[in-house]
Amino acid sequence: MRITQFLASKLKNFSNLPKEYIERSKKQVYWQTPREKNYLPRTVERKRFRYTTNRPWTGQFRQQNMPATMRRKVLIEPVEDWSFFRGDRIEVLVGKDKGKQGIVTQVIPERNWVIVEGLNWHYRRVGAEKEFPGIIIKSEAPLHVLNDIRLVDPSDLLGTEFEWRFTEEGEKVRVSMRSGRIIPIPETNNQTHDYKTPNAYIEREKDTPAAVVGEITFQPKLSTFEMDIMEEMGIKEERTPAKSYWY
């Protein structure tokens, strides 16, 4: 569990959007009970989605998962140690680009996929209609992280196997098993569609400043909410509370 949480923290969310917003954008509710006290909360909604290279909050994702559209379940092998991130230099092990190296531009952990810039591409036709033949575009197909790629050792720029180890400072890093060189996680992994790096982000009018977010405004007290209101409004309780018993 700790390793999974660590890797999840390393795999930054490219959307930079609240998780609740993403879940709400892809949610498909077919039926639910009224919000009345005489009804039990029951909801019939879609729970199985087909994940592809389209982001879950986009219209293309919803088009591929239209309501009442049933698709065959895709069996995914769980990856306990997710080790590929945006910006990694990898070597392709299969296909027409076998032996070539490229940079990871997109990570799809739901399918154990990565997209490599300029590799494993093909042509496809889009926008075809009755009176328009459409256009041909170049599209990069995903590669499987368990069978199709491997990391490149930064010391000699050759493909290598690796393992996770701890440094003397307690930091968990990827280490090449051939040379012992640390393979750092690229800074590109912190990139979102809002900024390249967190330090380069320019605050907008509706953004809450970091100083305000980090300010401690909660003062822990033993008094209840009602007691705090009475204290602020100068109300003094002069009644004697009745005795209560625990059984």
Curated annotation (Swiss-Prot):
GO terms for biological process: translation. Keywords: Mitochondrion, Ribonucleoprotein, Ribosomal protein, Transit peptide. It is found in: Mitochondrion. Signal peptide: none annotated. It comes from the Eukaryota. InterPro entries: KOW (IPR005824), Rib_uL2_dom2 (IPR014722), Ribosomal_uL24 (IPR003256), Ribosomal_uL24_CS (IPR005825), Ribosomal_uL24_KOW (IPR041988), Translation_prot_SH3-like_sf (IPR008991). One of its GO terms (cellular component) is mitochondrial large ribosomal subunit. PANTHER family: MITOCHONDRIAL RIBOSOMAL PROTEIN L24. Component of the mitochondrial ribosome large subunit (39S) which comprises a 16S rRNA and about 50 distinct proteins. This is Large ribosomal subunit protein uL24m.
